[in-house]
Amino acid sequence: MNHRAYAENIPLVLPMYYRYPKSREAYSVKNQYEFGTAFVVAPITTPEKTGINRGKVSVWLPEGLYMDFFTGMIYSGGRMLDMYRDIHSIPVLARAGAIVPMTEEILGTAAVHNPESLAIRVYGGADGSFTLYEDDNETNAYMKGEAVNTKMDLNWEKKTFTISPAEGKLELVPSKRTIKVQFF
């Protein structure tokens, strides 16, 4: 996602009306946003409801299928709906077809190596693709193309998920890497 922001000059966080400028609903959810291409996030900005200890947010979901990152609940889009969460959670909804690589390592803010283990979250219901971009995390060598790209594709109709061989400056990624794929 960071590379996309750099290469395409598109911020990581976008208001809903950025991709849906003709949708009236996109303008009505002022605190809701897209995080990258995979997530719709709707922070709760109202006090808790008395008796249920939950805050409420009205969420607009564009057409499509969405899965709650934390609860696994599935929602159909093309509508407004109310969501309730306690103070420790907010609605984070993954689009169908999203492929989300994550690390299981605690790297900290001073991390300068690419992770030795990945947990790839794959959200079914639609086709999807993602290119994992990795560089040296230290220099501007990426500006000269010194990086590694690993393409991942989900074909929902065929029920296949493919991780293509990494391409580029392969010494930038660990020689041994554990990959755990989780389907949602």
Residues of each region from the PLM?
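Catalytic core of carbohydrate-active enzymes
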Residues: 1-184
